[in-house]
Amino acid sequence: MIIAIDGPSASGKSSIARELGVKLGYKFISSGYLYRIITLIAQKFLMSSCDFISEDRLLNLILENDISFNDSSFFLNGENVESQILNDKIDFQVSFYSSYVGIRNIVNKKLREVVKFSNDNYIIEGRDITTIVFPESEFKIYLDASVKVRALRRYKQRNGNETLEELERTLKIRDDVDKRKQYGKLKLSKGVFYLDTSYKGLDDVCNIIIEKFNLKKVRER
């Protein structure tokens, strides 16, 4: 069983997917975290965070590094790097690198292989999860929220290291890039359950999703 969660950056996908995993006993995977790790790999081999690296060079660097994840933790060469990939420098570049078709193919293949060779149930979140990676998943969700709310959430997560104006501007740019991607663009897929999380708490959102999920299972019996 796969529950696929899609939506824009900072709409609550990771937090909600983690919590749903706990409540339902499903394993959690974030494709966004994988793209962030790849962006970290690129940054480690660049002199300046304002520079970018070619797709071919980055593909080779990925092969030279070990990316892994388990129990909701994400590793680069055996080191838990979650604290290193949630910052403004990664935010600034991750959309650029995730637009490379070759990079998306690597991440999508890795996600599909994990599910294919496992008997576990999964909650997988990320942009294009419901449209490209797992379009036939049993339950598809699209989480959304206003830019102002998303900026405020990220501001609280980052302990005020960036201003609300900076975060809002970054998110608007990110949305524009994600919606214009030739491959894996941000969009609603057919049959998705749309939920605006702007003024809802974590527990409220999870309860709404679980209720909808259970109702769907009853109807399909």
Swiss-Prot record:
GO terms for biological process: pyrimidine nucleotide metabolic process. GO terms for cellular component: cytoplasm. The keyword ATP-binding applies. Its main location: cytoplasm. Belongs to the cytidylate kinase family. Type 1 subfamily. ATP binds at G7, P8, S9, A10, S11, G12, K13, S14, S15. Keywords: ATP-binding, Cytoplasm, Kinase, Nucleotide-binding, Transferase. Its EC number is 2.7.4.25. CDD domains: CMPK (cd02020). It comes from Borrelia garinii subsp. bavariensis (strain ATCC BAA-2496 / DSM 23469 / PBi). This is Cytidylate kinase 1. The lineage of its organism: Bacteria, Pseudomonadati, Spirochaetota, Spirochaetia, Spirochaetales. It holds the Pfam family Cytidylate_kin. GO terms for molecular function: ATP binding; CMP kinase activity; dCMP kinase activity.
